């Protein structure tokens, strides 16, 4: 799974990959079957955490390499649209439900890393998460996303997160509930 030095990091990467492998494999098999039922028989391409695309057969071999695929795909889209606009230096921003991620793109290339952490116990404390040795687009993460709940804290200041509206009732933009207190 990882050919890099670092026994603990290699082990944690391998264990994480083994954990998600059967779930991911079943999901991809169901997805490919559903696409075939709709008459779509081309190879399904998936995005790796480093922004490259691979066939579903390749992705299933080491699914941990897709753990940050959504934000990586966003960064690659920013590179594409920046290039079409003649802009090579960009700041790509990806807002999810609980976190927002930013990526610096210089001269049409996102910054990359050979490893990163997931599931940090302390959101910004390096070393408090599970290290993964997989190539990835380097992202800066903040703990506030589109579903984060904002409130007035004890000092009268606005506090955002860590609570999230999740999908039910969902963010205010869903229009299902009002979050005014």
Model-based region annotation:
Residues 40, 58-61, 96-99, 133, ...:
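Short flexible coil/turn linkers enriched for glycine and charged/polar residues
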Residues 66, 88-94, 139-141:
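Short glycine-aspartate micro-motif
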Residues 1-88, 107:
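Nucleotide/phosphate-binding catalytic cleft detector across ATP-hydrolyzing
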Residues 179-181:
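Conserved small/polar residues in nucleotide/adenosyl-binding loops
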Residues 110:
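Post-Walker A helix-loop "phosphate-sensing" segment adjacent to the P-loop in P-loop NTPases
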Residues 147-177:
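Gly/Pro-rich active-site capping loops and adjacent beta-alpha segments
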Residues 85-106, 148:
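Gly/Thr-rich phosphate-binding beta-strand-loop-beta motif of the actin/hexokinase/Hsp70
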